[in-house]
Amino acid sequence: VVGEESRLPEQVLAAIDPGGAPSRRAAASRILDWAERVVDWSEAELHVATAWQPTGAEVLRGVLDDAEWNAYHEEAHQRAAADLDALLAERSSALPRDRVRLLPGTAADALPAFANESRIDLIVMGTRGREGRVGDLLGETAETIIRQVRSSILTIPPDTHETHETEAES
């Protein structure tokens, strides 16, 4: 827990990545489950955010002309929005749209900025499971975010089944 005094969180952020493989969607659902538990226990306000950027944005921005880039960028944005909406539609609890954010950029950049600006007390996020001792506890993105936020962070490790499924999908 970050901070000088111990208190219940008032603002909780579920940082999820609902797109792509079924294992990502399952991990995002687990993160939401944990965030909802914290919110139920603490009576905090829940926010949900996902960071997105077009695949290969760094390279393609310099290669595509403006019209192609804008179309590619918009398609990626629509896909990210659809993935997020689909996951939230499966949930039994309705979340006000003003507490759901689709943040442009990488998770390592966009999530800390949003958390700090919104005065988030607790971020609930997943890990990818890196190698080594630190990797046993955190993923690279979680490590980067921890260094940039004033919030406490609850990391949810990948389900063993999800980890094997992700490796098989690669």
Residue spans for each PLM region:
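Hydrophobic alpha-helical membrane-association signature
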Residues: 27-31, 80, 107, 141
